[in-house]
Amino acid sequence: VVRDKTNKIIGDRAFSNRVKIVSKLGDYCIKMYTKNRIGTVIKHIPGHGLAIYDSHFSTPAVNEKKKILNNIDFLAFKNKKSLFAMTAHIIYSQYDSNNTATHSKIIIDDIIRKKLKFRHLLISDDICMKALKYSLKENVIRSLKAGCNLILHCNGNINEMRIIANNVPKIDDFVIKKTSQ
């Protein structure tokens, strides 16, 4: 959901500044793409509209009240049928002031899985973005422990790929089932 202070990195990639429009357009896009056998990824869950900084370069922190987050930003993602969702590298301080959503078991379990009822594959955003403050290996481990099913790595650096490959488990039955649909 776009806001007045939404960082320009999201601006024109969001559907609207109204949660109902975002939600309905999201449902429609997921339905039509799926009907045509095209996979969808909803992002950046649980919401990126209140982030004023670009998570490619720094760690955004959202300090909004839970009621507003739940009724606007998070609500846009509720009950979505997409087979994939991508996490936000954003700290939501009202829920977990120490971790980005990607590294937060609280955000992933309580918000994304329970409140928003997302039951499919959760992908980290690019694991090399500057919003994540640990080493590559630690970012991978923290993302998986928090509840991400897959790790996204975008820069093509083979040495980084080896670090990631050496720190991720073999694909489990949940991932196999979801990617076979």
Task: Please annotate each region the language model reported.
Residues 2-9:
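Short, conserved phosphate-binding/catalytic loop or strand-edge motifs used
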Residues 177-181:
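A short, charged, Gly/Pro-tolerant segment at domain boundaries
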Residues 21-34, 39-174:
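Second-shell residues forming the walls of enzyme active-site clefts
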Residues 11-18:
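Second-shell loop/turn segments in exported
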